[in-house]
């Protein structure tokens, strides 16, 4: 079962040379799932960095998810796809039993449909403004409703910090996906730990 704190290591915030160091701090802080998102990197570079991150993640029993590229994700723990990426059925074919997560934005119907097709988890847009996600804001009702009908983990993404993590869990989210509140923090390990504590104390 996937844990509740999902951290995205994004190349927009972290230089390639710092990835391992930052990853280690995130893992020490207690992240449950780690995703490598490097939208502007070519595949060879993603694969090379992922191999190094995967060793660290494995030491902490944390899955490493690759944003997009199921052909790379299958070498590690799995992939996460959005609507501009590869179709779900094709990704599932490549990944087989590996983790496959999908961005559902503010669409619960898509999530329900994917649940029947064997998606591992889904992510919904949080109601908060976010520096990394351009989106329609979704309300808390989406999460309250999702809690009633989804059997899979579902994460809130977008503008999540410590206080908002608490709020999202109270409004029904299974977990939260965090980018800038951790990657831009002066103390990455401490920020990760505080958000983790906020989540698990709000369940």
Q: What do these predicted regions represent?
A:
Residues 125, 159-160:
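Short, loop-centered acidic/histidine patches that primarily coordinate divalent metals
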Residues 144-147, 153-154, 159:
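Catalytic-face loop-and-helix region of soluble metabolic enzyme cores
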Residues 174:
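Short, glycine/charged-rich "phosphate-handling" switch motifs in NTP-dependent
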Residues 130, 144, 163-164, 180:
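Basic, gly/Ser/Thr/Pro-rich low-complexity segments located predominantly at protein N termini
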Residues 1-88, 93-120, 152, 160-166, ...:
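Conserved N-terminal beta1-alpha1 strand-loop-helix module at the mouth
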Residues 83-89, 126-149:
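Flexible, gly/pro- and Lys/Arg-enriched active-site loops
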